[in-house]
Amino acid sequence: MRGPALLLALRALCALSALRGTARAVNNSGRWWGIINVASSTNLLTDSGSVQLVLEPGLQLLSRKQRRLIRQNPGILHSVSAGLQSAVRECQWQFRNRRWNCPTSQGPNIFGKIVNRGCRETAFIFAITSAGVTHSVARSCSEGSIESCTCDYRRRGPGGPDWHWGGCSDNIDFGRLFGREFVDSSEKGRDLRFLMNLHNNEAGRMTVFSEMRQECKCHGMSGSCTVRTCWMRLPTFRAVGDVLKDRFDGASRVIYGNKGSNRASRVELHHLEPENPAHKPPSPHDLVYFEKSPNFCTYSGKMGTAGTAGRACNSSSPGLDGCELLCCGRGFRTRTQRVTERCNCTFHWCCHVSCLNCTNTQVLHECL
């Protein structure tokens, strides 16, 4: 009896250790998100003629490779932080009417425990934050904010019968390369979660790339536009968020695939396969997940869900923002509040605007 009991205890201990190790690995994969609170606009400090890295508290959350990348690209820290801030705002906008509305908190793991799960929401978080870094860095290059990159000047010469390449194209290639080196370096291991995170990181970057658009400026007598100068411009980040939100809704559930044990092609051995064999394998643009999402209806410290109690809902909507769905069938309360706003504004020449104060009564519905 003692032998089997000891064996079971050892197995349980090993399982617990593995779970703890997984939790640490998951938390580390998103530690760099903590730099969102880095306030400085530069990562450089000149001291006695030498350039040194500012020891911001948030930088302690970065890996050695990430700190090296920041050091090698003066000015890029602000771009990374700005890109992450854009990603958070976009995430909260896209999910503002959902049970999970992309809540954030102070601290290194700004998205909370939901990133410990392999669900759709985690997939979107990784994709949108990766896209945010790529988008912000590419734009900063063309703005001259980063010392190690400039506009993309590779497109030069004739582009068509009535236009040619010129101007300052946003440097999407530098943005993608830096984003891959910086963001992906926080992922460790070869398990399903590792593959999922890397796939969604790349999907975010590819979305920024695929949404690039050509812009042109006309030249000619009296605006005749006989010749046009064109360049490549980044999409708005709202456009990136819209595309990723559509891919969130159509995300592919995957399992861990293994092609064999050929050491010569070890990188290709581990891959993602659709859970349903009848489905097509996910494309590089698709978001992937491997775990069903919680219902997000109630608070759970273990799951990292805040619940929907107290959330504002639309009593007349049959959609996801409606009280029936958002409140998970628990019902809702109705209250009124008086709001004073500026109204009936008039412009007086020159240059003054006068307004009245109007008080309105608003009807609010909140989930129980």
Swiss-Prot record:
Signal peptide: 1-25
InterPro entries membership: Wnt, Wnt1, Wnt_C, Wnt_CS
PTM note: N-glycosylated. N-glycosylation favors subsequent palmitoleoylation. Palmitoleoylation is required for efficient binding to frizzled receptors. Palmitoleoylation is necessary for proper trafficking to cell surface. Depalmitoleoylated by NOTUM, leading to inhibit Wnt signaling pathway.
GO terms under cellular component: extracellular region
PROSITE patterns: WNT1
Lipid attachment, kind O-palmitoleoyl serine: 222
Subcellular location(s) of the protein: Secreted, Extracellular space, Extracellular matrix; Secreted
GO biological process: apoptotic process; BMP signaling pathway; determination of dorsal identity; dorsal/ventral pattern formation; positive regulation of protein-containing complex assembly; Wnt signaling pathway
Keyword set, alphabetical order: Developmental protein, Disulfide bond, Extracellular matrix, Lipoprotein, Secreted, Signal, Wnt signaling pathway
Predominant place of localization: secreted
Effect of residue 222 to C: Loss of palmitoleoylation by PORCN
Pfam families, per the entry: wnt (PF00110)
Disulfide linkage: 91-102, 141-149, 151-168, 216-230, 218-225, 297-328, 313-323, 327-367, 343-358, 345-355, 350-351
GO molecular function, one term: signaling receptor binding
Protein family according to the UniProt entry: Belongs to the Wnt family.
UniProt function note: Ligand for members of the frizzled family of seven transmembrane receptors. Acts in the canonical Wnt signaling pathway by promoting beta-catenin-dependent transcriptional activation. Developmental protein that promotes cell proliferation in the developing spinal cord. Has a role in osteoblast function, bone development and bone homeostasis.
Assembly and oligomerization: Forms a soluble 1:1 complex with AFM; this prevents oligomerization and is required for prolonged biological activity. The complex with AFM may represent the physiological form in body fluids. Interacts with PORCN.
UniProt-recorded name of the protein: Protein Wnt-1
Origin organism lineage: Eukaryota, Metazoa, Chordata, Craniata, Vertebrata
Gene: WNT1
